[in-house]
């Protein structure tokens, strides 16, 4: 490569292109690339009859599982896979096929465009509209051109996996908010305890710490001198006044702000325990302001009584009495304020605040010098109450420490019990493992026994076959021996008759044959002994098999009996329930029958009473006949007649002219 020196003075100035056109040029190429990728994937889907866009969420899922296994462990990755699988199964079962494919394809392409650097803009929205239109108009109705069963699980994953990721995102957001809330609570508690610790220090150390804080604040305020000077030139406040303010005034202002916030929250009234006294000099007034503010802070923070003292508590000291340096109390009628005193008006508060804040730096310096001895000499009743409150708080602190020790002892005992339980769990696990090992060994032994039985059966079959073969050979040998003996006898007879020369050779042959016969008989006895032993082994194995079969039969019979007993118990419980229901129904029927019988008796009694009354009335009224002289009609029957009355054993005389009551 050649090194070329460029002339800097003759560099060409690049053409300035407008940002709008640059964005258009960059984005058009990007969106053209998106359209080309989309068209290629759709073409591949049409050619191969498979939706390749469903593989992108699957690839994202594999990457997320790998990242979770790498950074969060195996347990979380397994949990994530199980949750995603469950979500996929739910989407696969409960979403229709057409809507499933439509939602999956639309989500994939929308998410693919969403991952660009442009975000939401007009081209992305137009692409989204195009994708949704193509999916809804063309591909939503055409599901027969590809493998539905193969693509359906991937489509369910395209919907289920984003649901899982959204759920985890929502969970992380909620946990983040809860963690921030917990941090704020802990920060407030730490600030409260820090204030308690600072206020528990002696006043000398408090003053030293306040001076150090003031020096640090002044050192921090030094870099802002230039800006403060500019503000002063433009009519603002110079920074020297801020630096020259003394500690009581700063603390007074800060405490005034804190009390404004507390007063807005609580508004509980003025504390009745603070007794303020007037003073003659301004130094003692400001010293009293500081003491009163400190006492109010301790009362508010330690005792917990929230007061409604605003800025008037620090500035009303000019109108009230206080002890002087020698400890003498002014005895004027304005020396003691009322315990249930009211809050002064806002105008007086503002005037007193202006008086308090308009003190010169020299007065504040004298205050800093005289603050500690005056605090040591003068102790109002508020300080006595504060000391009592501090003692109470110390007692409460000791009680809380005792409670803490008790809780720690309980925690230690619980931890020891937990350790014991864990050791017991370990022992139980070991015992369980031993039992499982024993069971495994027993199963293996059973399998080995079965294998041995099968091998012995094979050996028995082979021995039986060998025995049958040997018996056949023996029979053949016997036949051959008989034939040889017959031929030998014939030959001997023939030789004796004809010649006496071959007798010796025949005798030798006979002896050899007898020896072979003895050997064969011995072999037969040995084989028979082996066969007997094998038969004994076979019988033992058969007995073992029969015992196993008996045990299996007994176990099956036992399980059947248990099922029968369970069924009988269930049927018995059902019968008892039915009997109880029948008894309850019978009792209800008896009660209703008794009630009906009582009502019937009551009605019968009422009927008898009514009949008796009707008879009495009929006996009292005379029989009246109505006749018409002019009309030839038949006489009209009376309205009330004794014929309609039933004959009852009544003591009344129906023919009596006057009613006579019965004599009892």
From Swiss-Prot:
Amino acid composition bias (Polar residues), ranges on this chain: 320-348
InterPro entries: Macoilin
Pfam families with a match to the protein in the record: Macoilin
GO CC annotations on file: nuclear membrane; rough endoplasmic reticulum membrane
Phosphoserine carried by residues: 305, 332, 631, 634
Glycoprotein among keywords: yes
Transmembrane parts of this sequence: 28-48, 75-95, 120-140, 154-174
GO biological process: neuronal signal transduction
Ranges of Basic and acidic residues composition bias in the record: 253-265
Glycosylation sites: 324, 340, 452, 655
Keywords: Endoplasmic reticulum, Glycoprotein, Membrane, Nucleus, Phosphoprotein, Transmembrane, Transmembrane helix
Presence of the UniProt keyword Membrane in the record: yes
Stretches for region Disordered: 253-274, 320-375, 630-664
Subcellular location: Rough endoplasmic reticulum membrane; Nucleus membrane
Mode of membrane association: Multi-pass membrane protein
Similarity comment text for this entry: Belongs to the macoilin family.
Its biological purpose: Plays a role in the regulation of neuronal activity.
Protein name: Macoilin
Record organism: Pan troglodytes (Chimpanzee)
């Amino acid at each position: 490569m050649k090194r070329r020196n460029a002339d800097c003075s003759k560099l060409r100035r690049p053409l300035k292109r407008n940002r709008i056109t640059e964005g258009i040029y960059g984005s058009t190429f990007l969106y053209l690339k998106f359209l080309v990728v989309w068209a290629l994937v759709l073409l591949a889907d049409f050619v191969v009859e498979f939706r390749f866009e469903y593989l992108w969420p699957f690839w994202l899922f594999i990457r997320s599982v790998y990242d979770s296994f790498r950074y969060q462990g195996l347990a979380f990755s397994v949990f994530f896979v199980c949750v995603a699988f469950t979500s996929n199964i739910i989407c696969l079962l409960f979403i229709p096929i057409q809507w499933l494919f439509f939602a999956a394809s639309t989500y994939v392409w929308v998410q693919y465009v969403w991952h660009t650097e442009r975000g939401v803009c007009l081209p992305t929205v137009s692409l989204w509209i195009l994708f949704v239109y193509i999916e809804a108009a063309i591909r939503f109705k055409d599901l027969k051109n590809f493998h539905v069963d193969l693509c359906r699980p991937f489509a369910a994953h395209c919907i289920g996996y984003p649901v899982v990721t959204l759920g985890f995102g929502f969970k992380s957001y909620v946990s983040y908010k809860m963690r921030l809330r917990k941090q704020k609570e802990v920060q407030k508690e730490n600030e409260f305890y820090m204030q308690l610790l600072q206020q528990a220090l002696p006043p000398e150390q408090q003053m030293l710490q306040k001076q150090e804080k003031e020096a640090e604040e002044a050192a921090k305020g030094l870099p802002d001198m230039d800006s403060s000077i500019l503000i002063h030139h433009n009519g603002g406040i110079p920074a020297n006044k801020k630096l020259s303010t003394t500690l009581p005034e700063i603390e007074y202002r800060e405490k005034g702000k804190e009390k404004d916030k507390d007063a807005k929250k609580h508004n509980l009234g003025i504390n009745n325990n603070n007794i303020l006294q007037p003073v003659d000099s301004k130094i003692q007034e400001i010293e009293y302001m500081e003491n009163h503010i400190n006492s109010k802070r301790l009362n508010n923070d330690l005792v917990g009584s929230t007061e409604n003292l605003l800025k008037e508590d620090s500035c009303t000291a000019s109108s009230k009495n206080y002890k002087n340096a020698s400890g003498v109390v002014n005895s004027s009628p304005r020396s003691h304020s009322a315990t249930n005193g009211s809050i002064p008006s806002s105008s007086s508060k503002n005037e007193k605040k202006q008086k308090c804040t308009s003190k010169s730096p020299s007065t504040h310096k004298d205050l800093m010098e005289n603050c500690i001895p005056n605090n040591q000499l003068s102790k109002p009743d508020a300080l006595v109450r504060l000391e009592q409150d501090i003692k109470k708080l110390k007692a409460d602190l000791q009680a809380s420490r005792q409670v803490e020790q008790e809780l720690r002892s309980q925690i230690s005992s619980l931890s020891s019990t937990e350790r014991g339980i864990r050791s017991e769990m370990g022992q139980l696990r070991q015992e369980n493992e031993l039992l499982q090992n024993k069971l495994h060994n027993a199963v293996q032994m059973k399998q080995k026994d079965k294998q041995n039985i099968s091998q012995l059966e094979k050996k028995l079959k082979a021995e039986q076959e060998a025995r049958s073969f040997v018996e056949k050979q023996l029979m053949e040998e016997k036949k051959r021996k008989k034939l040889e003996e017959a031929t030998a006898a014939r030959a001997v007879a023939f030789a004796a008759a004809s010649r006496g020369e071959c007798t010796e050779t025949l005798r030798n042959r006979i002896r050899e044959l007898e020896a072979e016969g003895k050997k064969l008989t011995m072999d037969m006895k040995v084989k028979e002994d082996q066969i007997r032993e094998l038969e004994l082994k076979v019988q033992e194995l058969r007995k073992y098999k029969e015992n196993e079969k008996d045990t299996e039969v007994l176990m099956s019979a036992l399980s059947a009996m248990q099922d029968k007993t369970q069924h009988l118990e269930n049927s018995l419980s059902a019968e008892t329930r039915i009997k109880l229901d029948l008894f309850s129904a019978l009792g209800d029927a008896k009660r209703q029958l008794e009630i009906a019988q009582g009502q019937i008796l009551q009605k019968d009694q009422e009927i008898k009473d009514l009949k008796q009354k009707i008879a009495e009335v009929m006996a009292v009224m005379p029989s009246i006949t109505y006749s018409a002289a002019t009309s030839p009609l038949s006489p009209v029957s009376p309205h009330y007649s004794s014929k309609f009355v039933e004959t009852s054993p009544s003591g009344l005389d129906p023919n009596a002219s006057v009613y006579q009551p019965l004599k009892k």
